[in-house]
Amino acid sequence: MKSFKLLSRKFKALGNERRLRIIEELLKYKRLSVGEISDKINLSFRSTSRHLKILDNANFIDCEHVGINMYYFISSEAPKEFLDLIKKFN
């Protein structure tokens, strides 16, 4: 049952165009701050943060603090098949 919940979370995370664009940008640039992501996908800082939290909860991305900034990158736990599928539609 637990694995179905995680799978459901992953599909929900990918079921939004803006979150797919965030993943696409992180695949392209490797590591970005919330502000950089927000500028690249033309979305408010607050909305971008909300989408990043959903992607983080689904284990697609990780983050690290550097000074006062938070940088996001693709998680090593992100399923390769999902990432390959996203790259295909670039």
Positions of PLM-derived features:
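Pre-recognition alpha-helix immediately N-terminal to the DNA-recognition helix
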Residues: 20-24
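Short capping segments at the starts of secondary-structure elements
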Residues: 17, 29-33
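Beta-hairpin "wing" of winged helix-turn-helix
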Residues: 56-66, 73
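A short acidic, leucine-rich amphipathic alpha-helix
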Residues: 37-38
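Conserved segment of winged-helix/HTH DNA-binding domains
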Residues: 3, 11, 28, 71-90
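Short, hydrophobic-biased segments on the C-terminal half of alpha helices
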Residues: 52-53
